[in-house]
Amino acid sequence: YVDRIGFKVTDMYPGRGYFLRAPGSHEHHNLFLLKGGDNIGFHHIAFELRDIHEVFGGGLHMTDKGWETHLGPGRHPLSSCYFWYFKNPCGGAAEYDSDSDYITDGWEPAEWESSPESFAEWAYAEGAARYSGIQTGKT
């Protein structure tokens, strides 16, 4: 991705995962690659939304349409963004996010320890509807 497409590394979990942003993007990451076993593979793709309201609204809509929550909603400490992940039927996950840190061209990638605390400041494990009493349209 870096050599062939021009993605830039934003941050990393050394030897474990890489946060990459597309050419011209100032979002913290558009793609996250995670090493699992002996392979490096696709973990998730991120879709940037305008604000936390769209993350929650979109997340509730996806839930109503039968998409299974992987994790979220929640907030990442590395990018400061709000998130909601959905299991992708083809593998990996799709992430709705908003309010990510603005990454300048002079950004220097940082190395982080991989831990639950570095992944999420807070998060719901099964989506917000379960905890809030929100009607999702399912009976």
Where do the PLM segments sit?
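Solvent-exposed, charged amphipathic helical/linker segments at domain boundaries
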Residues: 28-42
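Core segments of cupin and vicinal oxygen chelate
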Residues: 1-28
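Well-ordered beta-strand positions
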Residues: 10-12, 34, 85-87
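Short beta-strand micro-motifs in enzyme catalytic cores
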Residues: 16-18, 43, 80-84
